[in-house]
Amino acid sequence: MSDIFFNPIWDVRMTDTSLRDGSHHKRHQFTGEEVRSIVAALDAAGVPVIEVTHGDGLGGSSFNYGFSKTPEQELIKIAAETAKESKIAFLMLPGVGTKEDIKEAQNNGGSICRIATHCTEADVSIQHFGLARELGLETVGFLMMAHTISPEKLAQQARIMADAGCQCVYVVDSAGALVLEGVRDRVQALVAELGSDAQVGFHGHENLGLGVANSVEAVRAGAKQIDGSCRRFGAGAGNAPVEALIGVFDKIGVKTGIDFFDIADAAEEVVAPAMPAECLLDRNALIMGYSGVYSSFLKHAIRQSERYGVPAHQLLHRAGQRKLIGGQEDQLIDIALEIKREQEAAASK
C-alpha cells in the first residue's frame, strides 16, 4: 500500500498537468526534450506532482483522440528520470487504458495513478483502483463533468471510488462550467462523505475565467489537492494557471511549497515556448464553459468546422445541448452535417 505523498508543511498539494491536459492544446505532439525541460523547471520550482500522459490518458493515442508524436510511456520515463523531487503522475480512463498500461507506467517511473470516469460511472474504476493499490501506487480518482450532477450524487460516486482504494477523489470541472458556490458545495459534500477515508481535490478550467477563483473556493471548502497548468497550458481556455494560483495562495496564506518567482520563470521561459499558442478565452472556449462542454472538444470542433465549413462555436453549443461527454467527440461530425444541411436548406429558399 502507498501512503499519500504530502509534506506536513503544505496546506494543499499542487499537481501541474501541463504535460497531460496541455497535450490536448498541443494535439499530443510533445517531444522528449520538451518534457525534459518542463519537468526540470517545475521540479526546481518545487512542484510536488507533475502529470505526464496523452491528453486522454494511457492508451489515448488513437484515431478517435489523436496520435502522440512521442509514445507516452517514453515521455513518462523521461519525466521520471529528470525529476529530482517531484513525483510523476499518469492519467488513465477505464476503457481507453488497460491494466497493463498501468503496470508499464509504473515500471517507467510513474508513482501516482489518476483514474478518471464520467461523474456517474465511478463503478467502472473499481478493479483499476484495486490493481493500482496492489502495485503500491498512490491513487487519485477523477469524477469528470462534475457540473452535471448534484453535490449529493457526486458524493455517492466519490464513496464508490474511496471504497475501491482511491486515496483522493477530485471534483473535476471538465467543462469549466462551475461557478464558485457550485465548486464549494461539491467539495464540501465530498469532504463530509469521505471524512478521513480519502482526501478531496479540485481540477478547474478557465472557460468562464474562474479557474483560480474556483480553486480558492475548493481549498476553503476543504480540498487538499489542487490541479493547474503553467501558463494555463490545457484543453479549452486552459487550466487554472499554476503561477497565478501560487501568487494568490501566497497572499491568502495557503502553503504549497512552490516558489512563486521560480514558477513564474518556468511558465514564462520554459512552458510558454513549448506551447503552439496561448490558451485563449475566446468565443469557442467561452461557449464551452457556458454550455457545459468537455474542454477537450475544442480542437475536435475546430477540425470539423474547417472540414465542413460550419462555425465551431455552433458545434460546441449543440454538443452542450446534447449533453455529450468525453469519448463522444465523433458526434461532432453528426452535428456538423446537421448544421450544414440547415445552411443549405436556408440558402435554397
UniProtKB/Swiss-Prot annotation:
Signal peptide: none annotated. It is an enzyme of class 4 (lyase). Mn(2+) binds at D21, H203, H205. Substrate binds at R20, D21, S174, H203, Y294. Disulfide bonds: none annotated. SUPFAM superfamilies: Aldolase, post-HMGL domain-like. The record marks R20 as: Transition state stabilizer. GO terms for molecular function: 2-isopropylmalate synthase activity; 4-hydroxy-2-oxovalerate aldolase activity; manganese ion binding. Gene3D superfamilies: 1.10.8.60, Aldolase class I. PROSITE patterns: PYR_CT (PS50991). Transmembrane segments: none annotated. The active site is at H24 (proton acceptor). Keywords: Aromatic hydrocarbons catabolism, Lyase, Manganese, Metal-binding. Belongs to the 4-hydroxy-2-oxovalerate aldolase family. This is 4-hydroxy-2-oxovalerate aldolase 2. It comes from Mycolicibacterium smegmatis (strain ATCC 700084 / mc(2)155). The lineage of its organism: Bacteria, Bacillati, Actinomycetota, Actinomycetes, Mycobacteriales.
